[in-house]
């Protein structure tokens, strides 16, 4: 792996060191999170195992477990897993790489990835191929990836004018993808796309700061929530913060 991969990994260790499970639960209760959490569970099966690859503090897994799903989690940030286990010892969590999952072919019924695969220089295809490998035929993939929205483009322009990298910095890598790129990537890696929707428009506004931010951990203001609801209707893609895709495995690709 590259030096940037290792630096990004360390950045996540530092991020999780400053976070807490209780605060992450507050994020899950925010309206913008319900745009995803209120939708994708209906596509998951309670008959098999659901993996969250890149689970962080595992609050999503705790929510799904309470809903009756059988869940496991994996992350390369050990500190986050230690914190999650201390909060909920019964969780099945494992340290590992999303590109080399320690699970057999065709063994899992669901694969969740929330804001993970965009952090790798080599793109999202290797991670999607590995997701395909471990899913059973007909298994469900749930994926969220940042979108190159209006605010993101403004930030890129600002960085370019300052002579900085437009995508990342020296310690943390992140990329964005259009809905067309994501659909093509899923189809290339053996998935049929069941759903592709823009989400979290209020959080795009949060990126502008000022009146769009409320006190608290990444909280959007009432103004951001109200305008975000309007933008979701009148300009769904230009102000999309993160695209949610749900796919079904229709052919086995593997690594």
Q: What residues fall within each predicted segment?
A:
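Active-site micro-motifs of SAM-dependent methyltransferase domains
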Residues: 100, 118, 122
């Amino acid at each position: 792996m590259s030096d940037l991969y290792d630096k990004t990994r360390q950045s996540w260790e530092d991020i999780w060191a400053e976070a807490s499970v209780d605060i992450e639960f507050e994020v899950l209760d925010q309206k913008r999170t319900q745009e995803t959490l209120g939708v994708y569970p209906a596509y998951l099966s309670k008959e098999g195992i659901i993996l969250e690859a890149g689970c962080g503090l595992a609050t999503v897994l705790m929510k799904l477990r309470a809903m009756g799903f059988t869940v496991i989690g994996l992350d390369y940030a050990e500190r986050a897993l230690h914190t999650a286990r201390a909060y909920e010892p019964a969780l099945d969590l494992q340290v590992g790489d999303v590109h080399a999952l320690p699970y057999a072919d065709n063994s899992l019924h669901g694969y969740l990835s929330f804001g993970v695969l965009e952090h790798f220089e080599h793109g999202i295809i290797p991670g999607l191929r590995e997701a395909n490998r471990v899913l059973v035929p007909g298994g469900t993939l749930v994926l969220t990836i940042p979108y190159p929205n209006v605010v993101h483009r403004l930030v890129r322009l600002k960085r370019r004018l300052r002579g900085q990298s437009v995508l990342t910095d020296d310690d943390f890598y992140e990329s964005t993808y259009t809905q067309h790129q994501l659909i093509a990537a899923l189809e290339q890696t053996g998935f049929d796309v069941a759903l592709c929707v823009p989400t979290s428009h209020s959080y795009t506004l949060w990126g502008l700061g000022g009146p769009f931010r409320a006190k608290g951990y990444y909280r959007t203001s009432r103004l951001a929530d109200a305008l975000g609801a309007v933008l979701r209707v009148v300009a769904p893609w230009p102000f999309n913060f993160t695209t949610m895709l749900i796919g079904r495995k229709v052919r086995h690709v593997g690594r």
